[in-house]
């Protein structure tokens, strides 16, 4: 039972370490994600970072063309088999319980190798959260860097044990090598999964259903209601369960035993483990569905005269949506009883890097919380409904954007395109900070734009100049196509208008949904 005891003791130590870091011990009226579960969910979500598949197809096509019409079929088959066996993996790098890196595998490098290249000796004393158990090649370098802890999702590892590949024996040998590295390492290599607090899933479902993105979508699409959210969520649940869970219990036990988790194969540990994993996948699918992947909706500039100019500088919608879901996950660490807000800052370098995120790299993230080191009762928690202004929270709480800027792990470079993703419209307190920090783009909801409330106002966002603003709305260049006389069809669970030309072509091609000015996503 060594592994089980280690998992439980490390969970306890993780909870203790979070005390005093942005009020980690806070307990209040709303359920809250633990930091361990937040980092785990972000690692799973980073495995789904868009764009890598398209890069892989392009790379493979170039390779085939370079070999000529006949090509080396045997070599191509071998390379293809190896790529299928190596699973894309997400990684969250944490130092002093603060995120300093979000990564995913690329076409050429595993995510552990990318972490070594990006962080080097700075990995010392860091905690690493992988979406799959890393292979021995990654593990030996990470351990050598002096990391403190390596946590991984207890399912199919990076070198897959599920694929029917000819080199499955190599996968088992790699798993044994990784286990030996773990046994002889000073770093803790373990599974950190904590049960979700009571009512957490229900709370996430309710708040995701009511979030600005879903409600605005439902109001804007003719004939649609919020039932599309439930349908979209069910699709995501099926997709993520296939990707992150092992449906067959006996097969799951075999994998756990192969990767050194024999003690988790006995009940009640095994059943508890599977239930915790299912709960986290349900939560991830729920949050991901709150920023739906739609044809006509996305993050666009509202100014008609700037649409064509800005298009060439905006992110693909899939990437913008992915980053906003990161912010939505962060919002569930909030200390605000009324409204959870998350923010994440990314930048885009001049050229592509070795990371699976391409030219984009992580700057910082945050959520709204009270000052670091404070305890639950140190500051007022009342909102503007309370008559006594002295005991209202607004003078004490640190906004998500402010925390993201304060705890950023890299400088914001003026010559690069930097962007912040916020789950709500930035308030008048944060807008000048964002502009002053040199951030070039803001992606946010706009439900509160122009509103002035008792303790907080949102007047400056609409008037902001010098920073590009992309808000969740109908694509201005496609809005005209929503003719109420057109036939309807469901796409990703959402009612969408369909032209006769679309009907004719639908049987001849995959469901390729075009974005504005040539951007496209395969749904």
UniProtKB/Swiss-Prot annotation:
Residues 486-516 have a biased composition (Basic and acidic residues). Signal peptide: none annotated. Keywords: Cytoplasm, Hydrolase, Metal-binding, Nucleus, Repeat, Zinc. Its cofactor is Zn(2+). Gene3D superfamilies: Cytidine Deaminase, domain 2. Residues 71-169, 318-483 form the CMP/dCMP-type deaminase domain. It catalyses: 2'-deoxycytidine + H2O + H(+) = 2'-deoxyuridine + NH4(+); cytidine + H2O + H(+) = uridine + NH4(+). The active site is at residue 401. Pfam families: dCMP_cyt_deam_1 (PF00383). Zn(2+) 1 binds at residues 110, 135, 138. This is Cytidine and dCMP deaminase domain-containing protein 1.
